[in-house]
């Protein structure tokens, strides 16, 4: 009963806070909504019949999912240049040019170093191998519902970022989640993972600082977390073709 009462109070506070926030910004929200009806994000008066990529209101499905994060591109959370990095000419990569044949400099100026699924990118979504290790460790040593909420939010953001590479899930959100069809560049939702992964990593670090003995008590989880991240990084270094069949060395 005590737990239920606390949950009810916390829920009520969240609802009241949300209502206050909405009421304070109601004018901006209303005018933005009103303006949106007259833009490409509003409902079109010209709707083609039997066209699968249209939404009932909002942007076109192909337009929304144009910048979809590749499934194998998700490894950039741990390894930043897993898909080549930013969409810039290979000639701008000084480290690569030191090993390249100078006779082909003009060709390198035409080749982009990014080879992922997106039309282009200014850089990968990167968290870091060490932070990922702490995140995995946090799944074992951190207690409480917050851990599972952060894990669920991380997985959800990754699945949504895949966009056209995971269309059944994307279609569900486009068809049934309000306002989702108003936004483009689904890969940008990985900003959630960029927040939740370090947050759980910090919670794990705090747990270790507060209870240093947990490192010896849960040593197998420490080894497992380190082994997973270090093992994958090592495989990337020596056998990238395992993860990317179309990889060209």
Give a label for each model feature.
Residues 132-139, 197-209:
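Transmembrane alpha-helical segments
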Residues 2-12, 96-108, 134-164, 213-225:
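Membrane-interface helix-loop-helix junctions at transmembrane boundaries of multi-pass membrane enzymes
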Residues 113-125, 156-196, 209, 243-249:
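Membrane-helix boundary/interfacial segments in multi-pass membrane proteins
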Residues 1, 234-245:
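Mature extracytoplasmic enzyme cores
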